[in-house]
A protein has these predicted regions:
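Extended soluble regions of mature proteins
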Residues: 23-289
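Bacterial Sec-dependent N-terminal signal peptides
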Residues: 1-33
Length: 289
């Protein structure tokens, strides 16, 4: 058997069997070209952005994050996406210009986050969320060998109905108030700063009278915490629509769940040695329904 094929098979098996300990990541990192990393267009300019650590083991160390997310606030659009992915793509573009390379870019340009997860795909990391008025649009990128599933959909925003509480805490020097809600099968706790006039937060969170600086489900499977509020001039970029055909939230959600729980079977992988694929992993989706 070709040694390269054996290596790929073993690597894929290791990824899926090791994903049990970290149910929020699975599959393999998709190719940049299929994401359209070098075809993005500028749709707005942000003057402020908020950076969030996702599931940090040490909030002071980016190398312990699953992701460093960012909320960019423009005049017409708000966007939540991965800063780690954007930084990695910027380095890849620089390298292509410097070397004149015209083929696929090596995956070694990944910047930030837990080193053991650099080869893994996560539906949260590899999705961009755009908010225009009262509408949210997700551009969902799927893992390696499933990029044909890349899709987009829209839904109303915000959909969360919050209950305010009296508790307060300080985050990044801002006095934050507690709020709670139940959303698509999970109970969430958010801490928002009324003195930061941004009605939004990480992922799809919003609907509070101030910027959400910390939010988590009550089981703390998913935890976002703001690590910086930055002011400057930031271009808000968008992938080309042609690479992300229109779909529905339910369809995207079902497919993201499928590729996370059972990646090898989902991509139609078959062992050349006749070995069975690893069992499904236990996955706790952010949206349960």
């Amino acid at each position: 058997m070709n040694k390269r094929i054996i290596t790929i098979i073993l690597a894929l098996s290791a990824v899926c069997s090791g994903a049990v300990a970290q149910p929020k990541v699975s599959g393999r990192v998709p190719t940049r070209e299929k994401r359209g990393y070098d075809q993005q267009i500028v749709i707005d300019t942000a003057s402020v952005r908020v950076l969030y650590a996702l599931n940090a083991k040490d909030i002071k160390d980016e190398n312990t994050y699953i992701d460093l997310g960012k909320l960019e606030v423009g005049k017409r659009v708000k966007k939540y996406s991965s800063e780690f992915i954007d930084l990695s793509d910027e380095e890849a573009v620089k390298w292509k210009k410097k070397t004149g390379h015209t083929g696929y870019v090596p995956k070694s340009f990944w910047i930030g986050g837990r080193p053991e997860l650099h080869e893994n795909w996560s539906e949260l990391v590899f999705s961009d969320y755009f908010i225009r008025g009262n509408q949210l649009k997700e551009y969902a990128c799927f893992p390696l060998w499933a990029e044909r599933e890349n899709s987009s959909y829209t839904e109303p925003w915000p959909l969360m109905q919050w209950t305010l509480a009296d508790e307060q805490q300080t985050i990044l020097g801002h006095r934050c108030q507690k709020a709670t809600c139940r959303f698509r099968g999970r109970d969430f706790v958010a801490w928002f700063a009324a003195d930061v006039p941004i009605k939004g937060g990480p992922w799809k969170f919003g609907g509070l009278p101030g910027c959400i600086l910390k939010v988590y489900d009550v089981q703390k499977i998913y935890v976002w915490e703001a690590v910086a509020i930055e002011r400057g001039t930031y271009q808000i970029m968008q992938y080309p629509d042609k690479l992300y055909p229109k779909s529905t939230r339910k369809s995207v959600w079902q497919r993201q769940k499928k590729y996370t729980e059972d990646y090898l079977n989902a991509i139609g992988w078959t062992s050349l040695e006749g070995r069975p694929t690893p069992p499904k992993i236990h996955f706790e989706p952010l949206e349960k329904e």
